[in-house]
Design a protein with these regions (language model features):
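Intracellular loop-helix junctions on the cytosolic face of multi-pass helical membrane proteins
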Residues: 1-140, 315-375
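Loop-to-transmembrane helix entry/capping segments in MFS-fold secondary transporters
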Residues: 7-16, 139-141, 243, 249-266
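Loop-to-transmembrane helix entry
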Residues: 12-15, 50-51, 132-152, 215, ...
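Glycine-rich segments within core transmembrane alpha-helices of 12-TM secondary carriers
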Residues: 12-37, 147-154, 264-284
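A membrane-interface helix-boundary motif in multi-pass transporters
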Residues: 15, 34-58, 171-173, 210, ...
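Helix-to-loop junctions at the C-terminal end of transmembrane segments
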Residues: 155-172
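C-terminal ends and interior cores of transmembrane alpha-helices
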Residues: 180-214
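Hydrophobic core of transmembrane alpha-helices in multi-pass small-molecule transporters
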Residues: 202-237, 241
């Protein structure tokens, strides 16, 4: 909220956040399979984690320092809400009532949880080990190529989501590209249901004699690539939308509470991330395994259904919940323009000596504002 309230700038956060994700999560995903080969037990070995964990810690520290540097200049009371330095502190007892009356924030928390759950489960290492290793029988030859293809497909979608957000609002962008992911994953689901009927119904990129790609693989790359690109580009989109919900609360009540909103959203985000590992563990137990499978474990009967549920069905249900929640989300592109204009007018009036209560009563919609705020 303090960095910018420009509807054309806020969506850019997803691009910068993705660069950070690629440096962090992307680096870990890239190095993990390479390091796992050097340790007996692969991903389950203590040596693997002793080597990989410091890499993640160093990357996290560097990215955190960049975040602190980025917000340092704007993290001042004069940029806080309508009242600036005069903004009153909110009591803890008021938080529940504020969230209860902020319907857009409630819906966004559902949407954010859905997007995060889909990404966390579908990209879980155990799920990918079962898919590319246990089912397809070639983890080393499929995981990295598919990961790279997924990132390649995501690039145009990041540009599209930002452009759509700038022109139509973040709600329209989120719903449009989550819908794309949902439709594409219907194709992925069908392909996984057909798996195992013959050698033609399995993923194959490279064989003993070179390139050995088949129609099944081409279709999988198309559906998975487009679907992954769409949902990876929208996975972090709810984060800048929290700022919209905070601005709405300032518009609605005059209170400035981005901290509590960000904390609540982050809490849901972390709970969902933790839940994803639990869901994977419970699902794996249904096929009789006592430990999480690695890329070297053989296929166990019923494992394909576990993969179908974790890799396709749960993400699809999560996306459906996101679309349902966002359907009633009131902060469209046009509404946010009005909110920003009204807040700006009130802020200037309070800075010039008007009481906050008077400013809140005097300006409540775009047509009530002076001409300079309506442009």
């Amino acid at each position: 909220t303090v960095l910018t309230n420009d509807p054309k700038q806020r969506p850019l956060f997803t691009i910068f956040n993705t660069v950070g994700s690629l440096l962090g999560m992307g680096a870990m995903q890239f190095f993990a399979p390479i390091l796992a080969k050097n340790y007996e037990g692969g991903y389950a070995s203590a040596g693997f984690f002793r080597t990989l964990a410091p890499v993640g810690i160093v990357i996290s520290i560097l990215l955190t320092l960049l975040a602190v540097i980025g917000i340092w200049e704007k993290d001042q009371p004069k940029y806080f809400g309508i009242g600036g330095e005069k903004t009153e502190k909110i009591k803890v007892s008021e938080y529940i009532q504020i969230i209860k009356n902020n319907d857009p924030m409630q819906r966004l928390m559902v949407a954010g949880a859905g997007c995060k759950l889909a990404l966390s489960i579908a990209t879980n290492t155990t799920v990918l080990c079962m898919l590319y290793g246990c089912m397809m029988g070639n983890y080393d030859g499929l995981y990295l190529p598919m990961m790279v293809l997924g990132y390649v497909f995501s690039v145009p979608f990041f540009l599209l989501t930002v452009r759509t957000s700038q022109k139509e609002g973040q709600k329209a962008s989120l719903m449009k590209y989550v819908s794309v992911a949902l439709v594409c994953y219907v194709g992925v689901l069908v392909l996984l249901l057909l798996w195992g009927r013959s050698d033609a119904f399995t993923l194959s990129i490279m064989g003993n004699n070179g390139l050995s790609i088949n129609l099944y693989t081409i279709l999988f790359i198309a559906f998975f690539g487009i679907g992954y690109g769409a949902y990876y580009a929208t996975a972090d989109m709810p984060i800048p939308m929290v700022a919209d919900c905070s601005d709405y609360e300032t518009y609605r009540s005059g209170k400035y509470i981005p901290g509590i909103m960000g904390t609540l959203f982050s809490l849901v985000d972390k709970l969902v991330s933790s839940l994803s590992a639990t869901v994977v563990g419970i699902a794996v137990s249904f096929v009789g395994l006592q430990s999480l499978p690695t890329q070297y474990d053989p296929y166990t009967p019923g494992m394909n259904w576990v993969v179908i549920v974790l890799f396709c069905i749960i993400p699809m249900v999560a996306w459906a919940a996101t679309l349902i929640a966002m359907k009633g989300y009131s902060l469209t592109g046009e509404k946010m323009k009005e909110i920003q204009a009204v807040n700006a007018c009130r802020r200037d009036a309070v800075a010039n000596g008007m009481k906050l209560e008077e400013a809140m009563t005097k300006w409540q919609s775009m047509d009530q504002l002076p001409a300079e705020y309506r442009s």
